[in-house]
């Protein structure tokens, strides 16, 4: 802005001088005395600037610098002379100054001339180059700039250091790439002039990854899991995708990074598929929807987190009909959908797991016959995934107990068994836990029967004296007993358990005038803590059900910090028995 001001001032003064009458030079405002129109000049590049002089005789103009030149003054009449000042092109980065002396018979004056250096940002070197290791690593960019800079980088680079100096080195770490080859630009831009920038493009090929870990090993690495709930399982309607229709935002990479920063290292992605079919006769899923799910999986596994993709409720085409007996039409859908899902996601290594269903039989009575139907569809899931080969030939697969109910999953009379799999040690069992349900799920007082109000306070140490909102069942010992059932039935036999969902509903104090808000929040945090700890202590991997109430879906930051703190306390305290 300073340079533009000098130029504007020069033009204004020059116009003022040259518009004077030859017969009345006092109108110029410089009188009969010696006068030079400029005492300071800023030269932009090599563009000349005009100087006007009022003198009794032709002035002499002398520059003290070789790069600074003056033309011979021209006489414009009435004692007015003009000359141009120009400079050689300045290819350096520094600012240089010179002095021009103007002398006539009736006076002398000096003009201070400034020429700014060349503005630039230059990439001096990159280490180890611009082609990155597929398995992850660290890169450095050495650059020089003539001023402070703004820096933009692709989301998959994490800054180690970042400085805005005349010369500096940027360092970034990057994780292994388990998806397609990816490229990203690092752009360094001068803050003072955004048109001046330098760009370096990095490329990272995908790694083949590792598929050697069994289910127990992978489960032991899952510190704390979370669901992207009410998002990818929202059905499409009239060609409009459902993602974001039930929540405040679509999934983005900053949200995923936020989950990792909180301490989660495993993410369950409930998915709808049936409403995304573009050819019903052949059960063909929209390839663009498969790509979108793959994109989210890629964000997760490239953060070195684990991902679970399932077929969720999905309109109930399978889960609501297991009580009707086996259906070849449903079985074909199960086969065709999983063949496409597994094929599209085959490139991901053992960080990705598949879950064949969600809560089979939840909306109908569970009998041994119903269980047999569930088992047939789960066998189809295994066969379809394994048939796609590649990484899927040995990928860990998750099988849902009847209704994902703990008691029904361990009930010997129902005769639930895992499907046959030629690959040993790659199976996990899934259950969900919303106990006590009148604390976690009940939406309205007495909706499930008389004298059944919503409960607000779980854990005896957080009960409120005299309140009918204290939980009267499902306390700590009950939670331990339930997870112990899964430990005895499966974990002790080498089969880890996934707690695919658990959470308690967020209650609005405005709906409960009598609520002790502090005690309620302490209680909810404690429920999160205890469920998480007890699950891990019994060999069950916890995946918290979250739909945007506890965590901001845009930036991945906590909305209910107390709830997240409870989860992390439980994750830290819990120790897997394997």
For each feature predicted by the language model, list its residue ranges.
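Short, solvent-exposed loop/linker segments at the N-terminal edge
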Residues: 41-45, 130-136
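Surface-exposed binding patches on compact interaction domains or structured appendages
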Residues: 33-35, 54-82, 123, 144-171
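Sec-dependent bacterial lipoprotein signal peptides
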Residues: 1-18
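Bacterial Sec-dependent N-terminal signal peptides
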Residues: 13-40, 105-124, 196-208
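Active-site mouth of glycoside hydrolases
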Residues: 211-213, 217-396, 400-411, 539, ...
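A short beta-strand micro-motif common to beta-rich folds, especially ectodomain repeats
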Residues: 83, 93-106, 180-192
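Aromatic-rich peripheral "rim/lid" segments of glycoside hydrolase catalytic domains that contact
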Residues: 509-578
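Active-site region of glycoside hydrolase catalytic domains
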Residues: 332-475, 484-504, 537-538
């Amino acid at each position: 802005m300073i340079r533009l001001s000098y130029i504007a001032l020069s033009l204004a003064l020059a116009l003022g001088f040259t518009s004077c009458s030859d017969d009345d030079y006092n109108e110029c405002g410089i009188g009969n005395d010696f006068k030079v129109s400029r005492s300071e000049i800023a030269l932009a590049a090599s563009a000349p600037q005009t100087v006007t002089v009022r003198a009794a005789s032709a002035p002499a103009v002398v520059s003290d610098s070789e790069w600074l030149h003056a033309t011979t003054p021209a006489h414009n009449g009435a004692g007015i002379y003009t000359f141009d000042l120009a400079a050689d092109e300045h290819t350096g980065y520094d600012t240089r100054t010179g002095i021009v002396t103007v002398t006539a018979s009736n006076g002398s004056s000096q003009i201070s001339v400034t020429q700014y250096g060349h503005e630039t940002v230059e990439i001096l070197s990159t280490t180890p180059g611009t082609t990155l290791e597929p398995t992850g690593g660290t890169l450095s960019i050495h650059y020089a700039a003539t001023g402070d800079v703004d820096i933009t980088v692709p989301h998959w680079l994490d800054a180690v250091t970042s400085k805005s100096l005349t010369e500096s080195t940027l360092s970034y770490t990057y994780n292994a790439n388990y998806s397609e080859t990816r490229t990203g630009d690092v752009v360094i831009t001068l803050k003072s002039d955004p048109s001046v920038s330098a760009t370096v493009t990095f490329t990272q090929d995908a790694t083949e990854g590792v598929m050697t870990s069994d289910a127990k090993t992978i489960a032991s690495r899952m510190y704390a899991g979370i669901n992207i709930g009410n998002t990818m399982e929202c059905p499409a309607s009239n060609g409009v995708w459902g993602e974001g229709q039930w929540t405040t935002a679509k999934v983005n990479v900053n949200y995923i990074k936020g989950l990792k920063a909180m301490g989660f290292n495993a993410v369950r992605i409930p998915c709808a598929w049936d409403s995304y079919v573009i050819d019903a006769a052949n059960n063909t899923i929209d390839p663009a929807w498969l790509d979108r799910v793959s994109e989210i999986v890629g964000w997760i596994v490239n953060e070195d987190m684990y991902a679970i993709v399932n077929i969720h409720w999905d309109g109930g085409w399978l889960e609501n009909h297991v009580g009707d007996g086996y259906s070849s039409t449903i079985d074909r859908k199960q086969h065709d959908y999983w063949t496409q899902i597994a094929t599209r996601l085959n490139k991901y290594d053992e960080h990705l797991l598949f879950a064949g269903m969600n809560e089979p039989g939840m909306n109908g009575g569970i009998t041994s016959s119903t269980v047999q139907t569930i088992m047939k569809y789960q066998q189809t899931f295994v066969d379809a995934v394994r048939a796609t080969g590649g990484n899927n030939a040995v990928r860990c697969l998750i099988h849902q107990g009847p209704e994902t109910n703990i008691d029904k999953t361990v009930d010997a009379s129902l005769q639930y068994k895992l499907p046959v799999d030629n690959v040993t040690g790659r199976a996990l069992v899934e259950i969900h836990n919303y106990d006590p349900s009148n604390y976690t799920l009940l939406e309205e007082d007495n909706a499930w029967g008389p004298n059944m109000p919503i409960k607000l306070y779980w854990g005896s140490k957080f009960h409120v004296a005299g309140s009918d909102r204290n939980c009267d069942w499902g306390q700590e010992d009950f939670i331990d007993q339930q997870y112990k059932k899964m430990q005895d039935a499966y974990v002790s036999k080498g089969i880890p358990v996934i707690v695919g969902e658990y959470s308690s509903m967020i209650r609005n104090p405005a709906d409960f005038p009598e609520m002790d808000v502090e005690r309620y929040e302490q209680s909810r945090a404690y429920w999160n803590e205890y469920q998480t700890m007890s699950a891990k202590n019994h060999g069950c991997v916890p995946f918290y059900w979250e739909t945007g109430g506890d965590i901001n879906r845009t930036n991945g930051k906590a909305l209910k910090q107390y709830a997240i703190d409870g989860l992390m306390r439980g994750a830290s305290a819990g120790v897997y028995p394997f």
